[in-house]
Amino acid sequence: MKKITIIAFFLALFANMTFAAEVNVFSARHYDSDIQLYEKFTAKTGIKVNVVSGKDKALQKRITEEGADSKADIYITADAGRLGAFDAKGMFQNSMTSAIKAAVPKNFRSTNWTGIAKRARIMYYSPERVKVNELNGMTYEGLADPKWKGRIVIRKSNNIYNQSLVASLVKNNGKKTTCEWARGVVANMARDSKGNDRAQIL
């Protein structure tokens, strides 16, 4: 089975690979900034970037099924949780270079993958129902406070972003404390979880 490289700073990875005429990027991201990065890479190196876009699960399935015949050189997706899960299947190879290590803080990279962007996990609130002073010093841990009973809506626990949030809390606060926190959040929910982020707001 072909192992592929997930690397956000592929400019650094491929900068000296002038023998490559093109590189195939399988991407689950959908941002104009990514396209601009590819264009800058091509302008600098002369290497053409072929982008195959799709949903994360579909791209992973395709790469896995194609095995050694996969055309993917680079796989880009959102969230370290997805990267960790795919890495656990042995689908990545060591992609670290001195340039990457110098540019990317250790907590934003692993041996086999590198982050290219950070995402803020923000909380939306209704100004009609929440007083600003209630949010003073607000943290994720604070969502378990009984004062929020019947006032919280959130996506399902099988959502990768929620799973990554919980993983970070386990890392920082420990499993026992995080379990207690999760029970507190569930007790404060206004309804059963459903829908995407937009559905929570509406």
What kind of region is each of these model predictions?
Residues 14-20:
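Sec/Tat signal peptide C-region and signal peptidase I cleavage site
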Residues 20-85:
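Early extracytoplasmic/lumenal segment of secretory-pathway proteins
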Residues 28, 32, 71-199:
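Extracytoplasmic ligand-binding site segments that recognize negatively charged/polar headgroups
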Residues 4-14:
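Sec-dependent N-terminal signal peptides
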Residues 15, 46-52, 124, 128, ...:
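Solvent-exposed, well-ordered amphipathic alpha-helical segments
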